[in-house]
């Protein structure tokens, strides 16, 4: 989504509202790749952001009838327009790159980055984190991303919508960007932070907005202004009970002493 895209900082370590880099989100129409099919390209937008973004999101937008990001391959499409390229290994046979049943790309089972992120977050939440801690964890990831280091006195970035201290917010941002699309980390993080309400598109109507497609005049549906709108015809409502799963009714039948989780009880 655009919200996820915009969570990645610019190379000066600032958000789109504060950066010294060009902060346009308008894609450029071109027809120079894969059989000269016209497509919107965001390569210039990726160049000025956190280096991880270009390794996560494809430089070509795909929507509508789709776009074959692999030459000769099947068209790919996305409700947000953003195509995923993370873990796509261009060195392997194209036939395997676009199959879900057999792909020879190595996938991590556990990340050193997760250890860094967990440690930094725990220390920050306890109020015991130091600049040395940041240099041994978060700032190592910043180096790889081509971003400036942060300190314990990091300034408010202006996009904090969780009501937490600026340092906690930046650690959460780092976690989001580093682990984007990985193993449902984001979903479970939002649960433990009690922030699932941010995904409710009835109260946050822009949360499912996608890419800026103003330069493609052929699109006449599923848009909100200049942006693709993935929420068209879809309602994603939040309820507090979603922080817990219900205990299966069969288990309660087996053990009547089990009590259903709060808010899942039938009247």
Role assignments for model-derived ranges:
Residues 6-267:
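Acidic/polar-rich alpha-helix caps and helix-coil junctions
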